[in-house]
Amino acid sequence: MTGRGDPARDMEAARAIARQAAALGGRAYYVGGFVRDRLLGRENTDVDIEVHGLTPSQLEEILDGLGGRLEMGASFGIYGLKGYGLDIAMPRRERAIGRGHRDFDVTVDPFLGTEQAARRRDFTINALMEDVLTGRVLDHFHGVRDLRRGVLRHVDDRTFPEDPLRVLRGAQFAARFGFTAAPETIALCRGIDLSALPPERVEGELRKALLQAERPSLFFETLRDM
């Protein structure tokens, strides 16, 4: 991710990108934890958007016209904007080709439908999308319902196990928000091998659980169940 700045400025930049994208027939959406935390009434300075319906060259031209693009991972369809903290991504498909959160085959698909784009997310509460211009929330996997009920539920039985770090992320989210993992998510996690996870990624999730959680003990309790 880019270095974070002022979220209000980043949202202004997001709207500028969205307006130009719309003029070309595309749409821009807030995605990920930013949408989740807005619906929870929590502050989140990590402004992330996903731009649909434009080619990479069209998006790059927009960003260059707004001050210059930062190629955070252009081959993966991920950009930044000079002077701002937001991340700008294009829709993509991901497929694990290695073990332990290390190797993924990534295919950028600018015209991927929003449901398919959201399907690569880990949990339903992180798969929400919000139209930057209209504020309309796209909820393909009942993430709003799970937010209201305090339930942590995985999005897809097939893609979720491809990244074993998601087990630790699940425990970390449960601790951070005081949520309860769904029984089917716990059952799925029990079959995932964590032995190949890089130590630094394990440490990162543990650190988040200890420093950001409402109840850090829930991290260990949830992990025990998983």
Please state what every model-predicted region is.
Residues 1-226:
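Catalytic cores of the polymerase beta-like nucleotidyltransferase superfamily
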